Swiss-Prot record:
Involved in the export of arginine. Important to control the intracellular level of arginine and the correct balance between arginine and lysine. Induction: Transcriptionally regulated by ArgP. Lysine has a negative effect on the expression of argO. GO terms for cellular component: plasma membrane. The keyword Cell membrane applies. This is Arginine exporter protein ArgO. Keywords: Amino-acid transport, Cell inner membrane, Cell membrane, Membrane, Transmembrane, Transmembrane helix, Transport. GO terms for molecular function: L-arginine transmembrane transporter activity. Its main location: membrane. It catalyses: L-arginine(in) = L-arginine(out). The keyword Cell membrane applies. Pfam families: LysE. Belongs to the LysE/ArgO transporter (TC 2.A.75) family. The chain crosses the membrane at residues 1-21, 37-57, 68-88, 111-131, 147-167, 182-202.
Length: 211
């Protein structure tokens, strides 16, 4: 059964490693050393719920609900544009230390709300967990399926905690004005690039829906 565990671990790692909204948010919280362990835990738990839903049959709801998929897609577009704008605004600030200090004033619940939006308003998360993992893990028997799911869940926990801890450890180097400008510019570009991709997918879905 360990072979199924390592298959899930490898596939989960391959899907989670690319820089996306979730990873960027966890990394930034780690650099700020602001609730970064809590955010890593909540991201991992969110992935656990999504992975279990995808592998154990919940994918049918999203795949059979084009209106729900469209709602998630366009909600993600709006959120990513807003999040990217905030990153660009911080990067272009004449006093980036002051701008970063303003961000640090955010309360715990606002940070949690942002994390939930980053995770649950990203349609790529549903495609990864429901379509990819659901199609592969859903074909397995009950016991192998559990080991496969455990492997993918392990990848999420290892990655998010590792990213948060590593970012916090490197914080003294990454919190310089130059590093913060570069990081925020990269994050802004990634967020807007993903938003444009989602908008393109959303237009295609709308055309198919009304054709």
């Amino acid at each position: 059964m360990f072979s199924y565990y390592f298959q899930g671990l490898a596939l989960g790692a391959a899907m989670i490693l690319p820089l996306g909204p979730q990873n960027a948010f966890v990394m930034n919280q780690g650099i700020r050393r602001q609730y970064h362990i809590m955010i890593a835990l909540l991201c991992a738990i969110s992935d656990l719920v999504l992975i279990c839903a995808g592998i154990f049959g919940g994918s049918a709801l999203l795949m059979q609900s084009p209106w729900l998929l469209a709602l998630v897609t366009w909600g993600g577009v709006v959120f990513l544009l807003w999040y990217g704008f905030g990153a660009f605004k911080t990067a272009m600030s004449s006093n980036i230390e002051l701008a970063s200090a303003e961000v640090l004033k955010q309360g715990r619940w606002k940070i949690i709300a942002t994390m939930l939006a980053v995770t649950w308003l990203n349609p790529h998360v549903y495609l990864d967990t429901f379509v990819v993992l659901g199609s592969l893990g859903g074909q397995l028997d009950v016991e192998p399926k559990r080991w496969f799911a455990l492997g993918t869940i392990s990848a999420s926990f290892l990655w998010f905690f590792g990213l948060a801890i590593l970012a916090a450890w490197l914080a003294p180097r990454l919190r310089t004005a130059k590093s913060q400008r570069i990081i925020n510019l990269v994050v802004g570009c990634v967020m807007w690039f993903i938003a444009l991709q989602l908008a393109r997918d959303g237009i295609a879905h709308a055309q198919a829906l009304f054709s």
